[in-house]
């Protein structure tokens, strides 16, 4: 699979580590944030994904512990149409404490996945399955 990558100012070159199918993304700028502040941190790259694929962006497991930031959209999804020269990838960060993220800090990671086939949605009156409870009910009696 070939992915075309354009690096912008401050970008750290991507590396693929052996035996990993997630690729780390680094902050392309140094950012100081205060508790409660939201900011999109530039990752400094634009990419052209292969047709029929999308990228999933999530925080690294240490991101919250090291910098106290959460990814505000839970998981970022970038489809192959977001492929222009200036379609720079970003990390939507919500700071839970005062923090500084330095240029080059590995704050998130991505992987490329094949998009699902277009589903056929069928409206029915009943699903004829047992109801299991509402959200948050798993594990309760």
Regions found by a protein language model. Give the residues of each.
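DUTPase catalytic domain/fold
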Residues: 1-141
């Amino acid at each position: 699979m070939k992915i075309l990558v354009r690096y912008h100012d401050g970008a750290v070159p991507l590396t693929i580590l052996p035996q990993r199918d997630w690729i780390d993304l680094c902050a392309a700028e140094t950012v100081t944030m205060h508790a409660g502040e939201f900011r999109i941190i530039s990752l400094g790259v634009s990419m052209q994904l292969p047709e029929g694929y999308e990228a999933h962006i999530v925080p690294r497991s240490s991101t919250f512990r090291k910098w106290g930031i959460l990814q505000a959209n839970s998981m970022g999804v970038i489809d192959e149409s977001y492929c222009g020269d200036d379609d720079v990838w970003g990390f939507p960060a919500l700071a839970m404490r005062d923090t500084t993220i330095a240029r080059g800090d590995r704050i998130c990671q991505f992987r490329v996945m094949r998009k699902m086939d277009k589903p056929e949605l069928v409206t029915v009156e009943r699903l004829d399955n047992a109801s299991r409870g509402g959200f948050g009910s798993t594990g309760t009696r």
